[in-house]
Amino acid sequence: MTAEVFDPRALRDAFGAFATGVTVVTASDAAGKPIGFTANSFTSVSLDPPLLLVCLAKSSRNYESMTSAGRFAINVLSETQKDVSNTFARPVEDRFAAVDWRLGRDGCPIFSDVAAWFECSMQDIIEAGDHVIIIGRVTAFENSGLNGLGYARGGYFTPRLAGKAVSAAVEGEIRLGAVLEQQGAVFLAGNETLSLPNCTVEGGDPARTLAAYLEQLTGLNVTIGFLYSVYEDKSDGRQNIVYHALASDGAPRQGRFLRPAELAAAKFSSSATADIINRFVLESSIGNFGIYFGDETGGTVHPIANKDAHS
């Protein structure tokens, strides 16, 4: 899309292709009442001095309180805290009633069981269109070692879910595959008969194994997103774990990217591949993804929790 005036929803969906973590930004207002909102626009800025930033919509109900606060905290949610993320993304009257929290050294709300937290003094507030960029100087932090909660394309993903999928498939040979997307087009290997890129698990982290394989295959930078399909192919006894992944711009070394209109006429190597591609095209068109569990002929699609990870 190259028009001077973009469709806001389409632009937001494109921004959502970038996989991020999820945070809840907290502070205390002038009356000492805790305030907070969910945000995935969190970035580390500098080690010396220790700086980070987060973006806040000017339309947020927390805008006045947050921008006038002298201090704030970033709570990096762990993979078990989807409910916390959803609570602080919605206009709930008492968001803090549903979470275990305490005041930090500088008076900011700190959540229990987060992957990490940072308490900050307000360094700067920068105007940026319909948002402001809040830059904080880290005054205290803690890293729990827990896995963080991931977010991409309107859905959550977690390392634990991937681990469970691999554990469930330990009795057979495990094939890792990917629906590798580049600006709406899907990468496929082969010439006349097309297949999803795939490799065999050799131990360790399946997402890292798959990312390394895809980058070697395509010569592009690859970000592994959410789990997309877990199924057994009874014809060969193999367990298949398929992720959604994103590729950087550029032409691949091997294979090709096909857009949805081209996929409709494509010939696939198996009915399972065709089913995955057809489901992805449909789910992409409505922006609502799920995870398939079953075999190559039938199973169940479990919806990925949807939310707006914004203030």
Curated annotation (Swiss-Prot):
Coiled coil: none annotated. Pfam families: Flavin_Reduct. The keyword Flavoprotein applies. The keyword Cell membrane does not apply. FMN binds at residues 38-41, 55-61, 88-89, 95. Belongs to the non-flavoprotein flavin reductase family. Keywords: Flavoprotein, FMN, Nucleotide-binding, Oxidoreductase, Plasmid. GO terms for molecular function: FMN binding; riboflavin reductase (NADPH) activity. It comes from Rhizobium meliloti (strain 1021). Its EC number is 1.5.1.-. It comes from the Bacteria. Signal peptide: none annotated. This is Probable flavin reductase.
